[in-house]
Amino acid sequence: GVKKCACDSYYAVDMEFKNSWKSYENYLDIVNEVDKLLENCNYKNRVDIVITGGEPLLYWNNQEFQNLIKHYINKNHKLTIETNASLNIDFQEEYQKNILFSMSVKLSNSLEPLKKRVNKSTLTKILENTKESYLKFVIGNDFLENAIVEIEDILKNIPQCEVYLMPLGDSSEAIDINSEKVVNLAIKYGFKYSDRLHIRIWNNKRGV
């Protein structure tokens, strides 16, 4: 078989899965879809909106994408974009500064070249223009020492921010194997630890 690298949700980007993707004509179609989901779960509090991928910043310059972001921010939702922060973006609108960017920068074990993984210009722009954005690194037991060297290099010459370490794994068993050493590494270097609760509960089930 073919080994899938670089993206842990390759069904979101691999054309092999295109028949499972859903297209929308405009941002209001997405809003209506989300509203239906909220009605079904009978959730009465204001929800946090998380845009993930794939890579959402591929659509940063798309007006419908910006309309979607603006819609939820204007309604006082907390809006998070999960990104690897490798693409160039500019902050041209004030509402964009209210986005929380969860920046999962890839390390060398993703097998992608450095120039495609680390964009310090984008990291700096995001951290200078937003208040709560943070960096997150997903690592396993076999990459701990190398990961710290790479993380410390990434943190050089960018604004200070929170840093989270997350255990690698697409099953509860894999998370169990990696979590203890990743926790200890976070404690040692003053980082925060983020677990993968959805994987502990549902393993790698899609749509949760």
Task: Give short role names for the model-derived ranges.
Residues 1-97:
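Conserved Radical SAM active-site core
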Residues 46, 57-208:
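Conserved AdoMet/S-adenosylmethionine-binding subsite of the radical SAM
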